Amino acid sequence: MHESAIVLAAFGVGHPRSLPGITKVVERVRQSFAPTPVRLAFTSQQIRRIWRSRLTRPLWVKEHPEVPSEVLMVRGPLATIADLHEEGFREIVVQSLHIYAGEEFEDLRSCLRGLASIQAVKPRWTPFRRLALGRPALGQPGIEHPYPQDLERAALALAPDLDQADEQGAALVYVGHGNPYYPSGVYQELEMVLRRTHPASLVAVGEVEGAFSLDYVRERLRQMGTQRVLLKPLMLVAGEHAHSDLAGEDAGSWRRTLESQGLKVECDLRGLGENPAWAEIYLENIRQAAASAGIAL
């Protein structure tokens, strides 16, 4: 029996149409690390409750055959790791599917630290031999994996999006989730890398929640002098933020606001998880986390 397993920890999403940003990554990881078991977990309790409530509605489940059972019955990282322990797995790599090392990632890291600290009186009963946490796509602070290199890697994965905008004669505007309580300056560092690696392209990176808001992006677009905008979520999935805050019909959405300024706006509502090159970032982070912890997958 395999004694190692992989847990993919995403924030989660509640709408079935947005699931490919997650399920495509899960599928890719399973293909790459077979026969190592791969489990999905959502860090958002609110999202988990949404799916759990749907389990009590058989008609809804029947009408949405595209939703995998592992999503309908999704659990949090702590419960998922506990389930694996009960099944006999003592070496686990938890890969964060978050974009950057923000609040959700720090909470996940704290959870793993707590589990790793458990020591039984008799060593053979210590729950886990090894626990490892794979860093987010845009890296994390520290010297083991310098995050500027992760930004370069991310920029390479995003190159097709800049090509798409260039073909349209448009400025590419990425919109991340952000966080009003946690630093998100890595978005602007990513923008700087994209501008340096694609000097002929017009690009800006904003966030729904945080300092680099729509006002920041509007000023950047004014400086560029562009008339066309390609708006894309810098998120694993194109969920509620993408469909409402970015592309919604409400007058306050990013699309409607930019259109009111005379700009022609196209929205490409595909999550980063649907980009094979972005999924490959997580695969590489899993390999590196496992190797650093001495876990064989």
Which residue stretches match the model-derived regions?
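Active-site-proximal alpha-helix that buttresses catalytic centers in soluble enzyme cores
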Residues: 1-297
